[in-house]
Regions:
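Pair of pore-lining "gating" transmembrane helices in MFS-fold secondary transporters
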Residues: 1-9, 90
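C-terminal transmembrane bundle of multi-pass solute transporters/carriers
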Residues: 14-177
Length: 177
């Protein structure tokens, strides 16, 4: 839920980043959205191809760090580096899909199948509540400190959650892969 607080609000700002910081146009906005979606499809396909023998909780934490690094570096790019922004966007899409598929697998392996649907429903409903607050805060932040700084701050926060999660042994024990 904590990561969603930062990812969801920043994800809606990719078109604004394209227009304002990179002086892009409708094609650039479409390209960025397409790369995010393509990265998500690629990440989902890679995760769905076979079962990986890796601790999925560690994978989730690593993907937090990858997403955070990509967002932070996106905010540090000069206005002439749109192609690099596009690459970071695609990587963020891949990492998001790996995170989501790993998260679902961890939940499925730890929750009784009789209540799994309700647990996922409650989780996703609860995770959207802080996202709404994050959207309000991110809009205010972007208006007052700039969109690039907002990307940097969100990236740093997401990385901190990823690194912090590695420090919790109880998290690692949620998956025995």
């Amino acid at each position: 839920v904590g990561v969603t607080f930062f990812i969801m609000p920043v994800s809606v700002m990719f078109p604004l980043m394209t227009l304002d910081h990179f002086s892009g146009d409708a094609f650039g906005m479409s390209l960025v959205e397409m790369l995010w979606a393509g990265g998500t499809l690629l990440g989902g396909a890679v995760m769905g191809m076979r079962g990986y023998k890796v601790n999925k909780v560690l994978l989730i934490n690593a993907m937090y760090i990858v997403i955070g690094v990509c967002l932070m570096l996106s905010g540090l790019l000069s206005s002439g580096m749109f192609a690099v922004f596009c690459a970071f966007t695609a990587v963020t899409g891949v990492a998001g899909a790996v995170y989501n598929s790993s998260f679902i697998a961890v939940v499925q392996s730890n929750v009784d199948p009789a209540v799994l649907g309700r647990v996922l429903s409650v989780f996703f409903s609860l995770s959207l509540m802080p996202s709404a607050i994050g959207l309000l805060g991110t809009g205010f932040l972007a208006e007052n400190v700039g969109i690039t700084t907002t990307f940097v701050l969100a990236g740093v926060a997401i990385m901190a959650i990823g690194f912090g999660s590695f420090a919790l042994p109880s998290m690692k024990s949620l998956d025995s892969s």
